């Protein structure tokens, strides 16, 4: 809190495009600043917007996904995808959605499905998943519609890489 107070004091005396209003500061301290208008201007400093996003995901999980059939998860992912794909790619609406649970529902929802239903994979399958997801990240980054699926490919690449790295560590310890 001391660092945040120092930041707001420095912000008050420094010329710049955006100065923090009282509601911006309350929003950061209350972890709901990503719900306020123009989130790009008020998410700094620190991870307050991310913690607010995690609280949103916890609420969505408890209200909509906890102990529910997998169809609820897929339906919520589809609704959130439709909302984002209906937005103007350069518009403020999409920018606001991306800072909230609607923008992160695809990787979060698939993470919940992965945790519930995924079976252990062998090393060769993990390697193929890792390479294909890296390839997908590059290819899907050039189009607005396919760009929506890039976070899912990043999550698949990350999880498969960590699992591969842990298997390499175990193999090295055996020798």
Where are these regions (language model features)?
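Loop-centered beta-sheet repeat module
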Residues: 61-62, 73-113
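Structural signal for the C-terminal ends of transmembrane alpha-helices
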Residues: 63-68, 85-88, 112-119, 140-141, ...
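Solvent-exposed interhelical
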Residues: 55-80, 112-129
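Helical transmembrane-bundle signal
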Residues: 4, 133-136
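Membrane-interface helix caps and helix-loop-helix hairpins in membrane proteins
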Residues: 39-45, 87-98, 138-147
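Small-residue packing motifs within transmembrane alpha-helices
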Residues: 7, 100, 107, 129-132, ...
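Membrane-interface helix-loop-helix regions
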Residues: 1-53, 83-89, 101, 154-161
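Alpha-helical transmembrane segments of multi-pass integral membrane proteins
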Residues: 108, 135-175
């Amino acid at each position: 809190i001391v660092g945040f107070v120092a930041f707001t004091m420095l912000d008050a005396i420094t010329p710049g495009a955006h100065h923090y209003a009282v509601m911006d500061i309350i929003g950061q301290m209350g972890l709901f600043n990503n719900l306020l208008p123009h989130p790009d201007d008020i998410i700094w400093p620190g991870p307050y917007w991310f913690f607010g996003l995690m609280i949103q995901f916890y609420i969505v999980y408890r209200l909509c996904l906890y102990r529910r059939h997998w169809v609820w998860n897929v339906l919520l992912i589809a609704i959130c995808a439709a909302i984002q794909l209906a937005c103007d790619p350069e518009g403020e609406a999409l920018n606001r959605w991306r800072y909230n649970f609607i923008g992160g529902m695809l990787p979060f929802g698939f993470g919940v499905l992965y945790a519930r239903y995924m079976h252990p994979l062998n090393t060769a399958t993990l390697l193929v998943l890792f390479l294909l997801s890296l390839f997908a990240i590059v290819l899907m980054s050039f189009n607005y519609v396919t760009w929506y699926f890039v976070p899912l490919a990043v999550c698949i690449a990350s999880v498969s890489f960590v699992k591969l790295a842990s298997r390499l560590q175990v193999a090295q310890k055996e020798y």
